[in-house]
């Protein structure tokens, strides 16, 4: 009997090492700003859909695939770095008529609820604070992958997400409705375990 225990216990210990991390524990991640993109797009007088992006997002993500309702995300966007890829428009965006970055240099999103929709899809409800105004926003997120990252050699997770906000909710409504009130958000991120 002792020999059986001596043989079995190490096997159980080794097997435990191969339990997927997502099943073993709630994971805490730090967003990688270099692999996180936040892109905004809108309708421009009906002719086109220009884009602007806010690079260098930072934040944290807590994820538990077995209890997704306990997951949460907290992100800060440096609005001072917004880039429309048109220098004159970028300058206008940073001014008082739009984001007023001198007074409001960053925006934040803090989740309040995560709802599993099946097939690695989640609705992430939360509060977006922009220009000192806080409004509820829902992001529709897809889990791309969770596991060890081959380059950084850490546990990692990746999501894509989309959502829509109204410019008028945040006093960014210049030229509405000729330029659309609705702004689509397209987000992609990688995050690494702390």
Residue ranges of predicted features:
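Positively charged n-region of N-terminal signal peptides that target proteins for export
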Residues: 1-6
